[in-house]
Amino acid sequence: MKIICLLIFVLLILPSVLAQENEDITGKKAPNFKLINLDGKYVELNKETGNGPVLLSFWATWCKPCLEEMAEFNKIYKEYKDKGFTVLAISTDAEKSVAKVKPYIKSKGYRFMVLLDTNNEVARKYYAQQIPFTVLIDKNGNIVYSHLGYMKGDEQKVEKLVSEMLEK
């Protein structure tokens, strides 16, 4: 009987313990950061936001939904890059798997910037507790959208927002 009671207690409590909601960062100023890109050069967020919207995509090579989402973001990037849209794909791969990032990006032919956040310092600034995690920043450096996870069709919301921001 004690085991059954304990099991029921654990099953009732476990979902609330496991549920980690990302803090709502929409409407806040985007924290600045400086990360290394795949060419070994530093990229600073504040130097990217003045031209138009910036999409931050937190991802990893081992995350299948992340890879699916990045393919969709690449399509959006191709459509709007000449109008000032920037994508910063922030790899959260740890030191042991970061060597897979550059070959993967090259194999897909992605042209947007890929940054390395191996210690998750920037991910923590944006409360990206899980991936994929997407943040859209306007040209004034304000966060206008954030989203955890990926399901086919999520990219349509991002594209709509990017299009609207570029029309202003």
Question: Where on the chain are the PLM-derived regions?
Answer:
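Short, acidic, Ser/Thr-enriched surface-loop or helix-capping motifs
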Residues: D24, N37-L38, I137-D138
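Sec-dependent signal peptide recognition
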Residues: K2-I8
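A short beta-strand-turn-helix
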Residues: F33-V54
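N-proximal helix/coil linker or "cap" segments that precede and/or mark the start of modular domains
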Residues: C5, P15-N32, T49-G50
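Thiol/disulfide oxidoreductase modules built on the thioredoxin-like
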Residues: P103-Y110, T118-S163
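Short pre-active-site segment immediately N-terminal to redox-active cysteine/selenocysteine motifs
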Residues: G52-V54, F58-W62, Q130
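Structural microenvironment flanking redox-active thiols in thiol-disulfide oxidoreductases
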Residues: L67-K108, T118-K125
